[in-house]
Curated annotation (Swiss-Prot):
Gene3D superfamilies: ATP synthase delta/epsilon subunit, C-terminal domain (1.20.5.440), F0F1 ATP synthase delta/epsilon subunit, N-terminal (2.60.15.10)
Pfam families per UniProt: ATP-synt_DE, ATP-synt_DE_N
Protein name (Swiss-Prot/TrEMBL): ATP synthase epsilon chain
Cell compartments where the protein resides: Cell inner membrane
Task performed by this protein: Produces ATP from ADP in the presence of a proton gradient across the membrane.
The organism's taxonomic lineage, starting at the top: Bacteria, Pseudomonadati, Pseudomonadota, Gammaproteobacteria, Enterobacterales
SUPFAM superfamilies: Epsilon subunit of F1F0-ATP synthase C-terminal domain, Epsilon subunit of F1F0-ATP synthase N-terminal domain
GO CC terms of this entry: plasma membrane; proton-transporting ATP synthase complex
Amino acid sequence: MIVNSCQLNVVSVEKSIFSGVIKKIYVMGVEGELGIFPGHSPLLTLIKPGLLKIFQVYNNEYLYLSGGILEVQPTVITILADVAIRAKDLDEKKVRDSKRLSEEKIKKMRHGDVDYIKISMEISKAIAQLRLIELTKK
């Protein structure tokens, strides 16, 4: 029997962010982007900061995840996110300013500096948040 939909639950430390029936999702795993469809083999993996693309029957939704854990069962997908943010909750000016400041800091550093990786991650997070803002403007 072919399964056409499954339940997705996205939960952060603070609250439930999304709960509903979906057709598929795309999320950034530690090995790259994962496409998860109903009936997928069981999976437990870490997720990296990036976009969660949710495809429902009649609409799509996008969230920013700062990382977390993805559990997949054939009929239920659960994401335990460190932080999950909807586009409407992001301040585009703040995100752009944060990205610009981080880029200025990193230009003054050398690759061996302790904070180089931390600031690189901040830039990656800002880029993902800006992608989310752009996707929801369309």
